[in-house]
Structure formats: C-alpha cells, structure tokens
Swiss-Prot record:
This is TNF receptor-associated factor 6. It is an enzyme of class 2 (transferase). The gene is Traf6. It is found in: Cytoplasm; Cytoplasm, Cell cortex; Nucleus; Lipid droplet. Transmembrane segments: none annotated.
C-alpha cells in the first residue's frame, strides 16, 4: 500500500494522527503478509546470506560514478533495485535495512515495503559493462565487471591454499612451492628410503637406523643400528673397565690398551684375586663355633682342592694372556704396515687420476650452501681443490676458492679464484717457470641449450713467483682473480644445483695455446701473487 493510497483513504475529516495510525496499521499488515509469503518464495534472501552479499568491492577504471553507488554499503550496486521514491540500492542491502531498521527508505525516511522494490535492470546492465581492474596483486588485466568472476577463476595471481600446508599462495607460485618450498612436501630418506614430510626430515635424520654416523672414539663410520655393538665389542679406542674390576681394579682404558694393562698389572690382579678368594674363605667359615653350619664347614674335603684348581687355572690364563698380547702386538704392526701401504696406493691412484684430466679439470664443491652460510656469518671460507695435471707429462696445479667476507674492503661478497702450482712427478723434465693460458669457469647447471657460464681467461706471467717451480708441496703464491664473481650474481643464476658448485679449469701450456686463442677470448687483468 503506497503512501498516496493511505492519504486518500483517510479523508479530509480525519486528523493527522488518525491518518498516521491507519497508515501504520496498514504497513504492519502488509509486512506480515509479505513476511509470510517471503518465507515460501525463492526471491527473498535469508538474513545470513544478506550479511555476506553487499556491493561490488572492486576498483573501477575510470572511477565509479556516484549514481551507481549504494548509499548503504558505499560500493557499486549489486542486483540494483529502485524504490518508489527513486533511490537505488543493492538488493541485499535494502532488504536488510528494511528488516533491521524499519520500513523506511534510508535516504529520505519515506515509508518503504519490500514488495515495493523493483529491479533496476538498466542500472544493472550499465554497472556490469563498466571496466574494472583485477583485484589480485600482480595482475594487470582489466575487463568488464560481468567477466570478473570468470577471470578470477582462471587468474594466475589469485590466492589458493597449498593442499599440503594450507598456506595461501598465488596460483602461479603454488606448484613451485609444493615442489621446492612446502614444509609438508614429501621427501625420501636417502638412507632408508622412508617417505616423510620435509619438516620431519631433520628429526628423522637424527634417529634413522641406517644413517651413517661417526664413532666418537675411533672415527669409524657405521650405520646407527650397528653403533651399540661397535661400542660394546669392537671399538679399539672406546673406554672400558679392567677385566678385574669386579675384584677391585678401578682402572679404565681404551680397549686396545687392555692387553697391555693386563700384562703390566698381573701381580696386582693376582693380589686382588687372592684377596677376593680369602674373603670368600672367611665368609664360608662358621660364625659360631658352638653351632657350626654343615654347609660351611672348613673341613669339607673338596674345598681346598677347588681353591688349588682355581689358582692353577689363573696361572694358565696368565700365560695365555701374555701369548695373546705378544700376538696382538705383532698383528698391530702388520695392520700398521697394511694401512701405510693402502695410504700409499690411494695416493698413487689419486695421482694417476690427476694425470688423466689432460689439462681440463672440473672441481665439484659439495655442501656449498654450508660455505655460503659461513660467509654470511663472517667466518673465513678458503677451499683448495685436489691437484691435477696439464698432461702426461705435465705441470701439477690446483685451484683455491675464497669467499670474501661482507666486511672485506673493495671485494666484499665476491668469489676469489686462484690457481697454484704444485710439486709434481714430472717437474724435473719440464721448463720453468710455467708458461701458458688458463681459463677459469663457474659452470651454469641449467638445462638450457645455451648455458650462461661465467668464465675468465688469463695468461701466465713467468716473472711472478706464482709460476716458479714450487719448493714445497703447494706454492703459497697463487694467480687469479680477487673479484672473479659476485655472490649475488651466483645466487641469481643457476650455478648451484643439488647444493653443488662446479668450477672448471682448462690449461694450455705454451705448446698448445692455440685452442684457447681461436675462441676469441681476451684475458683481463688478474690479481697476481695473492
């Protein structure tokens, strides 16, 4: 019932108060009828639904005109409706206002019923045709408002929860996060192949039964489940008590010193054993001569015989211990000789491998993340490569990598890379000082067809000490670059893979320098004698 109809029904003879009373009663009846019919109609919105739906909270381009703005939520009209008094509202906003604040227009307080609202399809079409910006951070696309919902479904910058850790990420980042960064991503133990979440791996590594651990006494590497038996039975340097500790010897020594201890303290052990036998003898004597116990009579004929047998056995065991000690010392000498032989053979194998590289050596530096962390904590990091030869015969060289500290002057946070000459097998047959060209390269480990290696080429300078024949195993003077590569460039590229950095050194002596020259590299100045 409109206000106009209410005024006409009142008549001129009635007072204004009677008119208002009739109008209020009519409105109350209309609200009651409308509320009943609304409960069965799908066109009306539930209160909980209306609380969630307001206007379009998006950024318009150009900015939204005020005529399309809802006076209640101050956002763009959603499902625009118009009142008899000519005002526009979001459908959900005005229905909620009527039900919460009373049957009146929020703008001019005119009487307003729900059944008086009618859709403003013209405004709806106009608003849906306006251009808006995607609200997702990083997305620069613009589209009509009617297409925004479909765009957000496929937008690569929309936030979605990681299915494993439930943290929000943009769609374009979630796959990388799941594979590389998610604390709940599945990883396998390299030792026992058990699958677990990444965040649980550190705890698992501390208790994995198949993980390699180092014996704290002898340095032997064993799997964790073997370590208890190793401590109890095998470890040569594990501390153990004397065999005669039960008789009163309180000495503790390494297991490999036990035989010597037994040999050097035989007399002491015999005295302790005799004292223990004497104490047993006293314990077996009757405490009361008037009422001797039959079970502990000293005149038992087998008692003294048993003591004699035990003493005889002790003498034999003492001789056996001496013999075993002598054998063990002999075997220890053999083992020492075998260890020296093995060490010599290992050195020869390493020397032969170094001679096979023919002047091209790739140095694999593992656990490089640990070295970077040490550098960030301002702990010096200096690493030397194994030696390698330029040929057979050839010069023996090695590389030195130094991570400069953040506080270093003029070279802070740089990788310094140098080459050192070493004493080699063929030094007496080679011309000195060393002359040639050296190419140093940090390899790009990406899968790209064209890899962006970082490399420098330098010529040897015979007048420097770095290229003279070394008089000690490794020449203390090096030749190379203090500022070979900045650590920031290293981190931004794909130079580190599986926590490993690859450094390549290619050496051409004065007899085969043509290969490097043909590639057009011009050496830059180096930092000599560092």
């Amino acid at each position: 019932m409109s206000l106009l109809n209410c005024e006409n029904s009142c008549g001129s003879s009635q007072s204004s108060s009677d008119c208002c009373a009739a109008m209020a009663a009519s409105c109350s009846a209309a609200v009651k009828d409308d509320s009943v019919s609304g409960s069965a109609s799908t066109g009306n919105l539930s209160s909980s639904f209306m609380e969630e739906i307001q206007g379009y909270d998006v950024e318009f381009d150009p900015p939204l005109e005020s005529k399309y703005e809802c006076p209640i939520c101050l956002m763009a009209l959603r499902e625009a409706v118009q009142t008899p008094c000519g005002h526009r509202f979001c459908k959900a906003c005005i229905i909620k206002s009527i039900r919460d604040a009373g049957h009146k227009c929020p703008v001019d307080n005119e009487i307003l019923l729900e059944n008086q609202l009618f859709p403003d399809n013209f405004a709806k079409r106009e608003i849906l045709s306006l251009t808006v910006k995607c609200p997702n951070k990083g997305c620069l696309q613009k589209m009509e408002l009617r297409h925004l919902e479909d765009h957000q479904v496929h937008c690569e910058f929309a936030l979605v929860n990681c299915p494993q850790c439930q943290r929000p990420f943009q769609k374009c980042q979630v796959n990388t996060h799941i594979i590389e960064d998610c604390p709940r991503r599945q990883v396998s133990c390299v030792n026992c192949a058990v699958s677990m979440a990444y965040e649980e791996k550190e705890i698992h590594d501390q208790s994995c039964p198949l993980a390699n651990i180092i014996c704290e006494y002898c340095g032997t590497i064993l799997i964790r489940e073997q370590m208890p038996n190793h401590y109890d039975l095998d470890c040569p340097t594990a501390p153990i008590p004397c065999t005669f500790s039960v008789f009163g010897c309180h000495e503790k020594m390494q297991r490999n010193h036990l035989a010597r201890h037994l040999q050097e303290n035989t007399q002491l052990h015999m005295r302790l054993l005799a004292q223990a036998v004497h104490n047993v003898n006293l314990a077996l004597r009757p405490c009361d001569a008037a009422s001797p116990s039959r079970g502990c009579r000293p005149e038992d004929p087998n008692y003294e015989e048993t003591i004699k047998q035990l003493e005889s056995r002790l003498v034999r065991q003492d001789h056996q211990i001496r013999e075993l000690t002598a054998k063990m010392e002999t075997q220890s000498m053999y083992v020492g000789e075998l260890k020296r032989t093995i060490r010599t053979l290992e050195d020869k194998v390493a020397e032969m491998e170094a001679q096979q590289c023919n002047g091209i050596y790739i140095w694999k530096i593992g656990n490089f993340g640990m070295h970077l962390k040490s550098q960030e904590e301002e702990r010096p990091v200096v690493i030397h490569s194994p030696g390698f030869y330029t040929g057979r015969p050839g010069y023996k060289l090695c590389m030195r990598l130094h991570l400069q500290l953040p506080t270093a002057q003029r070279c802070a946070n740089y990788i310094s890379l140098f080459v050192h000459t070493m004493q080699g097998e063929y030094d007496s047959h080679l011309p000195w000082p060393f002359q040639g060209t050296i190419r140093l390269t940090i390899l790009d480990q990406s899968e790209a067809l064209i890899r962006q290696n970082h490399e420098e080429v330098m010529d040897a300078k015979p007048e420097l000490l770095a290229f003279q024949r070394p008089t000690i195993p490794r020449n203390p003077k090096g030749f190379g670059y203090v500022t070979f590569m900045h650590l920031e460039a290293l981190r931004q590229g794909t130079f580190i893979k599986d926590d490993t950095l690859l450094v390549r050194c290619e050496v051409s002596t004065r007899f085969d320098m043509g290969g490097l020259r043909k590639e057009g590299f011009q050496p830059r100045s180096t930092d000599a004698g560092v």
